[in-house]
């Protein structure tokens, strides 16, 4: 069985292999939408509409204009929600290709007119940036380097719009082998679990939000 990895899938597995297996592979359970996830989806859609079509932000999101307006005004080749995939040999492929190994969808991607520099951004609607994970930007940078060979530098940002914080990170093409090696190692842990058929649960404070009701650590058991 070939697996298509992503930042969120890797994080799910590392958080709890049992949950990853039940939800993502066996598909016995589905993660339920919450007020927070629905809000995040609405913000993402509003930002995309503003950047691509100039649609005004809804009044509820008006205070976020300070984040999205500079993105829309950048003099560059701007793409929103561009689906990218790479194969296990680190070559580019389509998001839905049969041999896709890693997938990524940056919320925002802008490639400079020279083609040398790219900017990626991911919108966050959480109430704190304390545990911001720039690894997401790192993986997106790798995707950009592979899909856009002229790009030699990627400037990334996690935009925590609710709390008004921006977490930045920057990557160069020289770092690409190291980045790919790191993510290959993280993916190997999932592939190893698949090979041996062992998906141990990992108890944490997040168990109360988990949809896997059959697990011994589920809050209802």
Regions found by a protein language model. Give the residues of each.
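Short amphipathic alpha-helical segments and their helix-coil junctions
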Residues: 1-2, 18-30, 116-121, 186-194
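Metal-dependent nuclease catalytic regions and adjoining charged, substrate-binding loops involved
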Residues: 4-5, 86-92, 98, 129-132, ...
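Short coil/turn segments at secondary-structure boundaries
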Residues: 24-26, 35-37, 59-62, 76-83, ...
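Catalytic cores of nuclease domains that cleave nucleic-acid phosphodiester backbones
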Residues: 45-120, 126-130, 135, 147-157
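Nuclease catalytic cores
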Residues: 2-56, 81-82
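Short amphipathic alpha-helical face segments that pack within enzyme cores
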Residues: 42, 135-143
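An acidic intrinsically disordered interaction segment
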Residues: 2-15, 96-111, 174-181
């Amino acid at each position: 069985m070939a697996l298509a990895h992503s930042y969120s899938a890797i994080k799910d597995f590392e958080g709890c292999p049992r949950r990853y297996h039940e939800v993502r592979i066996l598909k016995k359970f589905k993660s339920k939408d919450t007020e927070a996830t629905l809000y995040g989806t609405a913000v993402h859609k509003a930002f995309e509409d503003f950047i691509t079509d100039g649609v005004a932000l809804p009044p509820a999101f008006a205070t976020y204009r300070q984040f999205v307006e500079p993105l829309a005004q950048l003099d560059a080749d701007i793409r929103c929600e561009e689906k990218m995939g790479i194969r296990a040999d680190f070559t580019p492929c389509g998001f839905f290709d049969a041999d896709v190994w890693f997938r990524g969808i940056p919320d925002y991607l802008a490639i400079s007119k020279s083609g040398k520099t790219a900017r990626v951004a991911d919108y966050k609607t959480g109430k704190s940036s304390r545990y911001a994970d720039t690894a997401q930007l790192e993986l997106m940078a790798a995707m950009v380097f592979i899909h856009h060979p002229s790009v030699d530098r990627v400037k990334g940002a996690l935009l925590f719009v609710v709390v008004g914080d921006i977490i930045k990170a920057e990557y160069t093409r020289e770092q690409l082998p190291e980045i790919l090696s790191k993510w290959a190692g993280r993916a190997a842990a999932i592939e190893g679990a698949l090979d041996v058929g062992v998906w141990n649960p990992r108890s944490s404070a997040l168990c109360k939000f988990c949809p896997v009701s059959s697990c011994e650590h589920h809050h209802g058991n």
